[in-house]
Amino acid sequence: MLSVLVFLPLLAAAILAVVRMPDRSARIGWLAVCGAELVLLVLLWTGYRTPQAGQLAFAQQVPWLPGVGSSYSVGLDGLSLPLVALTVVVFAACAVFAWREQRRPRAQAALFCFLQSMCLGVFAAQDVVVFFVFFDLSIAGMYFAILGWGHGQPARSALKFFLYTFLGSLVLLLGFIGLYVAADPHTFDMAELTRQAPLRDSGWVGGVVLAAVLIGLAIKTPTVPFHTWLPPAHTDAPAIGSAVLAGVLLKMGTYGFVRIAMPMLPQAWRAWAWVIIAVGIVSVLYGALVALAQTNLKRMIAYTSVNHMGYVVLAVGAAGVLTGGTEGRQVAVTGAVTQMVSHGLITAALFLLAGVLHERRGSYRIDAYGGLAEPAPRFAGLLAVAAFASLGIPAFSGFIAEFQIFTGSIGAAPVTALALPGILVVAALFLRALQQLLTGPTRGKSIDFLDLRTSETLAVAPLLLGSLVIGLLPRFLLDVIEPASRVVVDLVSR
């Protein structure tokens, strides 16, 4: 069933690309695929039982490249299942949002179905080569999404995105080869590499391999100072491109930390833990302060992504500091995975709403609008909910995630409290943006602004509802994540 979930969108992409059909049929086909994916997701989630340490649910393994110890291997645990669910939900929201797309809708549907398969493959993969193949192809998919449906300077932004992230993937590949060479017997199987931890007692060699893996994943996350591709990519990407980029693709980097770097290179991770914490703190504060200076709504949201992903980096870094209690480090990792899901839902909604501004008036400038609450109450209401969810107000998933991150991280490494002002700065910038966009007399580009259409509302509202459900009833998600977090912390402590 898991392989069907992964490859069904790819099959749909091939059909959409080859078979000529009316635009409406292509849109319906895309929605049908997303509906089928949601059904499969529900079946997987309800059928999921927490596997024992070192095992996986819904595991499948087929020989692929036996000469180098690589196979098509997929499976789910508490780290991957939430991100698979996030991927399916975000892509479904994008399919609904794109219902009225007039520019090559069949090609767009085919491309995003392809991209969905690649993203699902990254989170389901249990072989390092399979992970890398899906990881790399997702870069190509997003490149064409920005180039083909972007605005502003899409060619330049797409090229910068591709070159920067592709360079990161090459560095990541070097790290993977280092793990393979050190393993005895040589293998790319994640479970075997985790069991062996082949570079555990290798000194500086393990540090070099971890550095390669960290840099490759940090570029995709992105963390400071590897973030410079992100703002232009978001600014010039279409709304659904930004939603997928922020909601799903950025999680590949942080997922790689907990799936590959931490369990396979535990000794090196512990040695680098304080550096990782420092990068997380800098990313939190830098992302918040630079976001505060933005006048472009999309760039502002992009920099808040640097801030929010910085919390994840900070938490996984704290998990490598053994001076803290094991329970606190487990809470930090649980918070990190919860933050990945939370940020994906909320930021995807924010980027879709920002896309409405550009679609209606061709501008993301905050000062070009004012008093939007009067002509567009649905837009104003959902934007306000998304903003408050993003700043971490209780009742939403962001609060659950950040509370766990700081509770666990401060216990292990009190210096992580230096990142707390980032929450205040993000609150200030979102409240200021809401005041400028929504309140006061209707002026500028807000005059005669068309409120959200039904398809736009149906795309955004479920994302925010998901954040609310996690914020109020987090147990269904935490019960999945917590056992896997304990395993990761135990592996890092070896």
Which residues fall in each region the model found?
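Transmembrane helix-loop-helix hairpins at membrane boundaries of multipass inner-membrane proteins
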Residues: 1, 15-112, 189-194, 486-487
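Structural signature of hydrophobic alpha-helical transmembrane segments
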Residues: 1-8, 76-87, 128-141, 206-219, ...
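Central hydrophobic cores of alpha-helical transmembrane segments in multi-pass inner-membrane proteins
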Residues: 3-19, 31-44, 84-98, 115-117, ...
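Alpha-helical transmembrane segments of multipass membrane proteins
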Residues: 13-18, 95-96, 117-121, 144-145, ...
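Membrane-interfacial loop-to-helix junctions in multi-pass inner-membrane proteins
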Residues: 21-37, 101-114, 129-132, 150-171, ...
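Alpha-helical multi-pass transmembrane bundles of energy-transducing inner-membrane proteins
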Residues: 23-24, 107-114, 118-202, 290-363
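Juxtamembrane/interfacial segments at transmembrane-helix boundaries in multi-pass membrane proteins
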Residues: 49-70, 137, 169-227, 232, ...
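Predominantly late transmembrane helices and immediately cytosolic-facing juxtamembrane segments
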Residues: 224, 347-353, 414-448
